[in-house]
UniProtKB/Swiss-Prot annotation:
Binding residues annotated for a divalent metal cation 5, in chain numbering: C33, C35, C36, C49
Residues at which a divalent metal cation 3 binds: C14, C18, C23, C28
Record organism: Salmo salar (Atlantic salmon)
InterPro entries named in the record: Metalthion_dom_sf, Metalthion_dom_sf_vert, Metalthion_vert, Metalthion_vert_metal_BS
Matching Gene3D superfamilies: Metallothionein Isoform II (4.10.10.10)
Gene Ontology MF, one: metal ion binding
Swiss-Prot/TrEMBL domain comment: Class I metallothioneins contain 2 metal-binding domains: four divalent ions are chelated within cluster A of the alpha domain and are coordinated via cysteinyl thiolate bridges to 11 cysteine ligands. Cluster B, the corresponding region within the beta domain, can ligate three divalent ions to 9 cysteines.
Protein name in UniProt: Metallothionein B
Family matches, as SUPFAM superfamilies: Metallothionein
Binding residues annotated for a divalent metal cation 7, in chain numbering: C49, C54, C58, C59
Organism ancestry: Eukaryota, Metazoa, Chordata, Craniata, Vertebrata
Residues noted as binding a divalent metal cation 1 in the record, renumbered to the chain: C4, C6, C20, C23
Domain of life: Eukaryota
Keyword terms, alphabetized: Metal-binding, Metal-thiolate cluster
Family named by the database record: Belongs to the metallothionein superfamily. Type 1 family.
């Protein structure tokens, strides 16, 4: 289960490894917050987010 409640509060901070604002990850090293838009399954977990769109540049 997602340790953050970004979808409910719009913001979160998970142990220094993940910081969200308006449910958009600015730093995502673990499956803490959704990096890509909902429905982008390839970015659902274990991602390092590079962008906010669901395409090949989204995750690395």
């Amino acid at each position: 289960m997602d340790p953050c409640e970004c979808s409910k509060t719009g913001s979160c901070n998970c142990g220094g490894s993940c910081k969200c604002a308006n449910c958009a990850c600015t730093s995502c090293k673990k499956s803490c917050c959704p990096c890509c838009p909902s429905g982008c399954s390839k970015c659902a977990s274990g991602c390092v987010c590079k962008g906010k769109t669901c395409d090949t540049s989204c995750c690395q």
